Amino acid sequence: MPSSTEVIVLSSSSPDHIPSQTPAQSNYNPEKLFGLSPLSPSPPPLPSPSELFQPPTRSRFFKAQDEKAVVSSNTKQDSNTVAKANKPNATKRKAAASATGRSKKSKEDQTKGDTQTVIRGSNNALMKLDEEAPKKEPKARKKRSDAGVKRTLAKNRTITGKVAKSGSTQTDVTGLKAEEPVTFEPYLRKTDIEKAETRDIDDLQLDAAMKRRLDWTPTKDTRKQLVALDMVDGEPDQNRFGNLVSGYGYSNTSSDLEANSKRLEDGAATKRRRIELVESRVFPNVKHVLPDSARASKAPALEEKPNKRSKRITTLTGRVTALYVDDATDDSDSASAFTAAFGDVVNNASANRSSVQQRGKSSSRSHVIDSSVLPPEAAVSFLKEQDLVFGTCSQLEREDSPTMLRDMQMAIRASENDMTAEPKAYPATRPGSKFSDRATVSRFATPRKLWSVASRDLDGSLAQIEVLDMVNISKISELPLKSDDSPETAALTKGDTGYDAIETDTSFQEQSTTPAEKSPDDEKAVIKDPELSPPADCQLKEVVSKESAAPRIPQYAEFTDSQLSKEVKKFGFKSMRSRKKMVEVLEKCWESKHGATKAENQDMGKDIHAHQKAEPDTTRGQTKKRTRKTATLSETPKTRANPKIEPKASAHLKRRQAQEANEFSQASNSSFANVEEIEDSEDELIPSPSRLQNRYTLHSSETRGSQPLLVSDSPSSQERKNSESCIILSTFDAVAKPGMPDLSSQINKAVRAQPRSSSAGCKRPSWHEKILMYDPIILEDFATWLNTEGLGLVHEDREVSAGFLREWCESNGICCCFRKNNK
């Protein structure tokens, strides 16, 4: 009996739906062929971001598959029908695919596109349908089936197995299916992509990001609420000018106030050890005010156990700027110590202001410095009160006590004040010395007088020495006058050449001065030493003021030879060969015409002018011989007088001259110290300038020596003695003829006036040319030429020696030497 079979078609989307009859062939369109959804006239709405990035779930997955199955239900039915008709073609395609070496995945895709059929019964209608199927156009069906299979790749299939019975007659069909069981793997490419995308999206918090995207307004800074903490105290003077100006300065506070406040909430600072030299932790600029109870409770704790402050490196900048740092710049071991120290300072600010500022071991800066603008005067005074600390870092680290530094500075200031208030009275050189304790010798005297301390006199005692002005050496220095002394009794300093000042007798200095019956003749008879006297201008003014009405004697020494000869002819004399004789004759004639008394005043002014010209030519030889000159002067004092005293001179003038000579000899013998000097052997051969002048310039000494000296019986006044104590005769003025030109200037003229000469065809250089070529000048030869020929060229009758020429050469920077002695 024939066995009946049943054909069951298993569909992936609708397994329960089995068609009762063969469906009619439907028309194919792009939606059916390619699996596309039908086009809608309006574009589909965009999904929201929340739905787009929603993580996949199983409920969502199956829901989406059900919707697709409903949309393409008709297409699946048609594909099932075509699959049953093309079963032989499917087997042929599988064989061809295995022959061409297709991949396993492509085989599975092809088998997925075919419908799975199992024949279970004997249904004649279905069998006839299977037999008639190959009779149709296979090629067209093949292409359609291939296209349909390719188009249906995106469909999900259910897994089906072999359900044929063992007694099946269709061995060829069932055997083929048995050899290659078809299994279905769901296509999850889209879900895998979604999982990969959502794996990183879960942590991005995109919901909050979308909210921020819709609202672009910046968020408010919540930290601004902390500004209200500055107004806790509620001071009434918050709007004063000092606070307004301080707002423009650098506050040195961190921008992150919230972090600082959190760090101090626990009531103690961090315990880590800072290694930075600059304070990194900054307290907020808030004035802490503690209640009295809390302050009283914390004060004993601090007294019992003082906080130990670790030694840290200090610098000059840190010490100087320590007074200007706010509360937050110093270290504090705890917040309680900081507030307690602050409370103590507030209570004792008025009493211990200076000690609080210099407290080195305090845990914090106890006072709040309000920056204020001071007026210029107050600012300058404030800067003067500041203490500047100088030293190396190691010294500052060892000497960390500010009180020691302050005490040291106070001691230094006190010692300086004592030195300036009470200057030390240095001992004088002798009991009768003219230097007094009140007299200040140095022009550039300083409060400490360091240079004066280093100076000593001949006895080894300290002496005040004047500071010389070497630039303007020609100017005559002068000591400041005492308040009770007259200009005549002023102490005389050393001259331009650097000699020690000559001191007068003690008896003359101790006598008091009285105003005066002082005659004009007393001042006219004697001339002071220009090097040791007040300036010549002052002397000239005194002479001119007293004898302004008297005519002045002409300066015949400055006249030329022709002028002198004319003046001599006016008085009825013949022209003379010697210039010196003409000058003497003219002076005598003028004195006889105008009177001897008037001539004395003019003679005094004339000597001052003559000596002013000779002052610049001072030499080192004169400096060495100063002591010898003073000794010679004390032994042979000579009074200055006219070469020839006219009969008209009064007897009173003669008596004064004799008295002056006696008094000067007594004063010089009592005041000069006979100092023995060890001179070189060469210097012994050189005569002193005073001897040279005595040798060559005294032509009227015999006449002056023959004059009798009349001594007056009437004693002179005390004022006269006091004024004579400071009057010293110059060796040059005592022996030199008034009105004579300087011998050094005459030598200069003679050297330049020498004519060039040549002997035996060889040119001999003149003395001037030798000097210009820096040839050594033999002093003996030079003196011989000047005495025989040179000085005669300039009408000079005086003679010079080798010693005087040596001084002249040294003063002018000329190379000179003596002739060698072959002994």
Swiss-Prot record:
Region feature (Disordered): 1-177, 480-499, 505-538, 591-722
PTM field: Phosphorylated in response to DNA damage.
Acidic residues composition-biased segments: 676-685
Compartment annotation: Nucleus
UniProt biased composition (Basic and acidic residues): 128-137, 518-531, 600-618
Example GO BP: DNA recombination
Stretches with biased composition (Low complexity): 1-14
A Gene Ontology molecular function term of the record: 5'-flap endonuclease activity
Assembly and binders: Forms a heterodimer with slx1.
Primary role: Regulatory subunit of the slx1-slx4 structure-specific endonuclease that resolves DNA secondary structures generated during DNA repair and recombination. Has endonuclease activity towards branched DNA substrates, introducing single-strand cuts in duplex DNA close to junctions with ss-DNA.
Protein name: Structure-specific endonuclease subunit slx4
Organism: Aspergillus clavatus (strain ATCC 1007 / CBS 513.65 / DSM 816 / NCTC 3887 / NRRL 1 / QM 1276 / 107)
